[in-house]
């Protein structure tokens, strides 16, 4: 027989024929009782939590399965956390996270805090993450104010140990393919008949496709390798294309990470570097990411701790945009052959809809790159005045640069059945080139006073008082030109005619005061109160402060 209870060590008891009255005593599970959970601006014992906080051991997740992004990997790991992806394009993390549903008509995404500072899940190498906490209710989120109205996700990255130096390498090669292919109608004659039926069902008097084309396709499909009057194979002149098969293919993901960690009584450190190459499942959508992290903490004296948490990354993406795959597939038609003899196919049937086209042709008409550069560093110090009282000072600097450069590529479309070029090669004078450049930087100054003491072994008291200043500057410019001298000279300066130009800039600042008081009697009776006072430069100077508090919770 097995006896278990939350907070106690499970006990196995052997039952025999001579067993009568049983007296079972369970021992407290000290590891569980002492387990701490990351909360806003600190940690708390799990048994003393008053709010709804879930903790995910993310390091274990990375050991059991390939993970390309942190946000997509959170799906199914915590009750109340919903994760849905709007795009599977490599490097484009469109995963939408919702904590306990949608809480507002505007931005409903949770606030993301990485190592104590606001950040983006895109900026984290999954193998650098140690633990993730999800704050779900008002009690746990109030310390962050109005920004936390939709929940908070707290990410804690790995740190070094005080043991000897260790070197770890993790390498993985995986294969990526669509889990469920969209079933496309590849028999074009059947497609034409169904389209005619749909027209009749909505009361239209005329069919979309003439019966002679339906009969022609059925006849030519019986001999796909035969030649038409222009010497073109029937399977090209009268195609039955499955566009799901043409557009999607298997891709390879290379993921390599190297870390060095260790330390002594005075210092501990973790240095890591990562490389990921994701080919994608659609042409012209590949993505490469390079990242590095340095987490260093030193104790020059017993009362002083200093250190840094620094992260940098660069992500390069191809410019193929397949984020809305359904629209691409809706515009396709089985009566178009994808590519032959250096040209992209065009719908062969004269009765085909004007919106029908060749998705490969659309993907191939642009080339270039998208580049995302991130740099984030936090310098921190901790001074212990007494065993129970400490002061934390944190300074964070964050820099983000996004750059896109695109240019037109000569390509043309041919109706293969008769060799007519429908959309000719664009001359260099009409080819366009463009760039987008976005840059923002921010800094955060933070001061925290922490107090924690246990009286008479049963009265656990802790308090936090904090002050924070935040400033952010944003700048964007974009422009497009056409008229290249030669298609191989596709830099922006090489074009002759400006077609568009624009830009914008913005900056704002916030100032915040916040605090928290916790009391626990014998880890059974709990009390917590939070407050926050925020000021923003976006409001009028007389209305720039707002007060947010969370009622006391026994």
Where are these regions (language model features)?
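Short, small/polar-rich motifs associated with maturation and membrane association
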Residues: 1-293, 298-300, 305-307, 313, ...
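Surface-exposed loop/interface segments of Gram-negative outer-membrane beta-barrel transport/assembly proteins
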Residues: 32, 90, 162-239, 280-376, ...
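Residue-level signature of outer-membrane beta-barrel architecture
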Residues: 157-159, 262-264, 275, 298, ...
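Repeated loop/turn-to-beta-strand initiation elements of outer-membrane beta-barrel proteins
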Residues: 266-269, 303-306, 388-391, 459, ...
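Exposed, low-structure sequence patches enriched in small/polar residues
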Residues: 394, 466, 516-520, 530
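Residue-level detector of conserved catalytic or cofactor/ligand-binding positions
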Residues: 546-554
